[in-house]
Amino acid sequence: MVKYMMCLKKTINQLGAIILTSSILAGCGGGSASPPVVVTQPPPVSLTPEREGQSVARMWNEVLLLAIRNDFARPTIHARNLFHISSAMFDAWSVYKPRAKGFLFGNELAGFACSSSDFDLPIDILPHQEQAISYAAYRIIQHRFIFSPGSVQIMAAADALMLSLGYNLDDESLDYAQGSAVALGNYIADCYIEFGLQDGANEPKFYANTSYQPVNPPLVLSSSDVGNPSILNLDRWQPLSIEGFVDQAGNRIDEAPTFLSPEWGQVVPFALSDNDKTVFTRDGFDYQVYHDPGMPPLIDSALSEQYKWGFSLVSMWSSHLDQNDGVMWDISPKSIGNISEFPQSFEEFSEFYKQLEGGDPSTGYGLNPITNQPYAEQIVPRGDYTRVLAEFWADGPESETPPGHWFVILNAVSDHPLLEKRWAGVGDILGPLEWDIKSYFAMGGTMHDSAVAAWGIKGRYDYVRPVSAIRAMADLGQSSDPLLPSYHINGLPLMENYIELVTATDPLANGNPQHIGKIKLYAWKGPDYVIDPLTEQAGVGWILAEQWWPYQRPNFVTPSFAGYVSGHSTYSRAAADLLESITGTAYFPGGMSEFEVVANNFLVFEAGPSVSMTLQWATYQDASDQCSLSRIWGGIHPPTDDIPGRIIGAKIAIDSFELVQSIFEQ
C-alpha cells in the first residue's frame, strides 16, 4: 500500500489534475476494476521574488545607522547595538532555512537560554523572513533608543519603514507556534533584549561604570587656561573640562564627561574566548582583558624614551596640517598603501613612522590587479590631505561612530556593480537579502569583539591622551640637555624646527618675558585662531607647548576614554580583514574605492581643503591603515596606541570569521 501511495503521489506531481483511469491505477499496483477517480493537484505556489533595490535587512541597517547618528556618541554601546540587531535579523532569517542554525534563538549563551519551538514552515518563505526580520529589528531599536536625545526622529524613521512595508506597529504577540512571523520577530527581539539586560554591559543602569574612578582631576581647556597643572600621574587618563563640551554625536554635556566603558571587557563577546583572556585586579575590580598587548611605555619606566618620542611625534605631525607649506604628495594607490608588516616592539616604532615628513613605509602598487593598468597619480598639498584624513576618519560629532562607519563601507562594497556576492569569494552568487544578512552578522560580531577587546585594554591600562601628556611635559620643561634652561628628565625632547625653547628674542616673548625658557612647538595653532570655520584657518606656526590643541573641534577635543589601545585602529583592521574574508579578495571591487572631497566644502574644524581631491584605497587594509594614521594627525593617538590596536584587530577578524563559518556550515 505504501508503495502504491508513493507511486500515486509521483504520478500526480508529474501530471497535475488528472483522471486516474484503471490503466494508471494498475500501473501503480491498483485493480483494473476500480472506477475512474478525479484528483485535482493544487496549483503550484507562486514564490515571492527578491525585491528590487535594497533588501529589508539593508533598510533596517540604514535606520540603525540613522539612530546611532542621532544618539549619544558611544562606540562600545553602538558596536553592541549593531551586533545584537544584526544577529537578531540573522536568527529571524535562519529560522526559515531548514539547515541553518541561529546564534541566540534556540541556543544558550553565557547562561541565558532563548528557547525555540518547531512550527510548520511556509512554502513561500521570503515574506515571512522579511516580516520576522522587520519586527525583530524594530523592537530592539525601539527598546535601545527610547532614551536617546534623537528618539523622536529615530522612532519616526523606524515607524515609517514598518508602515511602508505594510506592517502593524501595535502587534506585540510572541506566540509563534502557529507560524506567525510577526510573533517570531517579536520573540527573537525579546530574547536579545532580555539577554542584553544581563550580558555585563550594565544596560539596566544606563551602562554606568560600577567601579572605575579616574586618578587625575580634570584638565581645564579654555583660551585662558594653559598647561596641565592639575595632573597627578602622567601615565594615566585624565578627564577634560571644556565649556560647551559636546560628545562625538554633537550632544552638549555640561559636566566633565566620565570615562566611557572602562569595564567593557566584562561584556559577553562574540568569538573572543577565555584562551585570549587575562584578568587584572585594580582597586578591587577585575578587569577582563582579551589579547593583552602588555604595558605601554610609561614616563618613569625603561621605555620612557619611547613615551616621550611618541607624544612628541604627535605634536610634530601637527605641523603637517598646513596647506601652504609647499609639500606635495601623491595620495593615489601608486604611492600609498601596501604595508607588508608592522613593528613588533615599541622600540621599533621609530623605523615605521616617518617622524619628520609624516606617514609610513607603504610602497603603493605598480598595477591595479583588476584592470592591469597603473594607478593614476594624484598630487595634492600634504596639508590638505592630512586635514581631510583627520576629519574623514574622525567619526566625531553627528557620525555613526567607527563601527557604524565600517557598516557604511560594507554597504558601499555591497552596492558596487562589480562585486560578485559569493560568500568568501566562492560558491553561488547570493541574493541581496542573504548577502546582507550574513555580512551584517559577521561584521556585527567583529565590531562587537573589537569594542570588548579594545575597551577592556583601555580600562585596564587607563593610558593618558596626547593633550594631557604634551601639556604636562611642557610644564616640566625639556629633557634633551641638562645644560640648557628648563631641564627636566620627563620634559619634552627638543627637536630643531619643531620643539624648541623660547628665547629672549623670540616673538612669543615679545611683551611676555615670563615665556622665556618655556617650550614652544611648531604646530597647528588651535581653535582660538578660527572665529569662522567656514572662511578661516588656524594655520601652522610657533605656539607655546602649554597651549597645544589636537586638530579637533574646540568643544570636543578628545574622546572621553583612555587612548591605549586605539579603538579606531582595532575596529578598522578587524573590519578590513573581515571584508577581505567575506568577499574573498583583499581589493575593493574594481581594484579601488574612492571618496570625493570638494575644495572648500568638506572640512568642519576650519576652512578647506584648498583643492578638490579623491581619497582612494586599493585594499581594505589600505583604508584601515589610513584611518590609523589619521588619528595621529588629528592629535588623538600616539603610535603607542596604534600598532597594538591593528595587531589585535587582525586577530579578532580571524576568530570572528571562523565562528561565522562554523555557524553557517552547521
Question: What are these model-predicted stretches?
Answer:
Residues 4-16:
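Bacterial N-terminal signal peptides that target proteins for export
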Residues 42-666:
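Acidic/polar surface patches and capping/hinge elements
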Residues 7-10, 31, 117:
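General secretory precursor processing signal
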